[in-house]
Amino acid sequence: MIYLALWGLCLGLTAVCWRLGGVPERRAAGMMLAAYALSVLLGGVRIEGLKVAVVTADVLLASGFLWLAMTWRRWWLLFAAANALLVVIAHISVFLEPSIHQRAYIAYRMLPGLAIPLAAGLGAWERWLAGERTPGGWLRRSAS
């Protein structure tokens, strides 16, 4: 039950990024949605207790956030990139020391993993509070 609530929170914050955010927020939302989809659809394959798709998604997400943080001047991108790197470090530590208990591994990944969409949502909200216009809508509007 808690797991579903956390997934709902992450998806809701991703939707906030898409709806209220600018270009970097929307790119981050797209990257997070792609990482969620990869983790869910291909999450069953394991090597040494690690889910290969989850590790791959987290490494790609960290790389994407590092790229966004170096490209755009937004405070939340640095915070999200740092937390994404912490998630990757969690994967590396479990790979190097397989005796780490599974619940400790999940807890080690959970807090930084939840901080990523939270930071993105706060960044989009801050942009909205500042009165900045969002880029073009989801669908093109008719010229009538």
Question: What is the role of each PLM region?
Answer:
Residues W7-L13, L60-M70, L114-E126:
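Hydrophobic cores of alpha-helical transmembrane segments in multi-pass inner/ER membrane proteins
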Residues M1-G44:
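N-terminal signal-anchor transmembrane alpha-helix
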Residues V16-A29, M70-R74, L129-P135:
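Membrane-interface helix-boundary motifs at transmembrane edges
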Residues V88-S144:
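C-terminal membrane-adjacent module
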Residues A29-G43, V52-L66, A82:
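Core segments of alpha-helical transmembrane spans in multipass integral membrane proteins
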Residues L60-G64, A80-F95:
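Hydrophobic alpha-helical membrane segments
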Residues G43-V52, T71-R74, S99-A104:
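Membrane-interface helix caps and helix-loop-helix hairpins in membrane proteins
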Residues M1-G8, E48-V59, A107-G113:
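Structural signature of hydrophobic alpha-helical transmembrane segments
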